[in-house]
From Swiss-Prot:
Glycans are attached at residue 118. Pfam families: Myelin-PO_C (PF10570), V-set (PF07686). Residues 176-243 are cytoplasmic. It is a single-pass type I membrane protein. GO terms for cellular component: plasma membrane. Belongs to the myelin P0 protein family. The chain crosses the membrane at residues 155-175. It comes from Xenopus tropicalis. This is Myelin protein P0. Disulfide bonds join 47-123.
Length: 243
């Protein structure tokens, strides 16, 4: 009986704590997915984060590196208590801290890039008590200067070719549009001419139909006059014969 009586207040406390206490939000880290560089140059590995808590003095940043074709991961940089530290390794004296935790920035710069630097870099940020979250990674690809220039030239050639294709396509469409418009205009003019011819033909037919009775009347008059003249001429001849 006593145990059941104790369980009820405990369960009630758990329920109240679940309702009153805010849920824990995971810290979110963001990086680029791919970064390119050339031998001897430098590249910035950008890393930003978002935390539901105020940025405390206990915020920490850790960068790890995993070479291509390798399963091993190395710690190359660490920031804690306001102090950056570079771990011993291939990036010793080649890493520069350019981040600012107050501005939620955890970026670093790699100097004097080499071909062996190709690999995946992981950025991990902790802001106690907000320590739950996933790291973000960025892949670095280092190329020779000649290869980079060749890639740049190839990209320019492809861009120019695409631009030419677009221009030619636009010209073809414009020519086709103008041709179709001209055809429509010509058809309209022809139809207008045909309508005018039909109208003239109708008018002429009406006029001819109106003039036909007049012509017939004129012919009848001329025929009557001719017959009268013939009649008069016949009477005169007969009188002459009688004399």
């Amino acid at each position: 009986m006593e145990s059941s009586g104790l369980r009820a207040p405990c369960s009630l406390l758990v329920l109240l704590s679940a309702l009153v206490l805010p849920p824990t939000l995971a810290i979110e880290v963001y990086t680029d997915r791919e970064v390119y560089g050339t031998v001897g140059s430098r590249v910035t590995l950008s890393c930003s984060f978002w935390s539901s808590e105020w940025i405390s003095d206990d915020v920490s940043v850790t960068w790890h590196y995993q070479p291509d074709h390798s399963r091993e991961m190395y710690s190359i940089f660490h920031y804690a208590k306001g102090q950056p530290s570079i771990d011993a390794g291939v990036f010793k004296d080649r890493i520069e801290w350019v981040g600012s935790p107050k501005w939620k920035d955890a970026s670093i710069v790699l100097h004097n890039l080499e071909l062996i630097d190709n690999g995946t870099f992981t950025c991990d940020v902790k802001n106690p008590p907000d320590v739950v979250g996933k790291s973000s990674y960025v892949h670095l690809q280092v190329q020779e200067k000649g290869a980079a220039r060749a890639g740049l030239v190839l990209g320019i050639i492809i861009a120019v070719a695409l631009a030419l294709v677009i221009v030619v396509t636009i010209l073809i469409l414009l020519i086709r549009y103008c041709w179709l418009r001209r055809q429509v205009r010509v058809q309209r003019e022809l139809s207008a001419l045909e309508r005018g011819k039909l109208h003239k033909a109708k008018d002429s037919s009406k006029r001819s139909s109106r003039q036909t009775p007049i012509l017939y009347a004129m012919l009848d008059q001329t025929r009557g006059k001719a017959s009268e003249k013939k009649g008069k001429g016949g009477i005169g001849d007969s009188r002459k014969d009688r004399k």
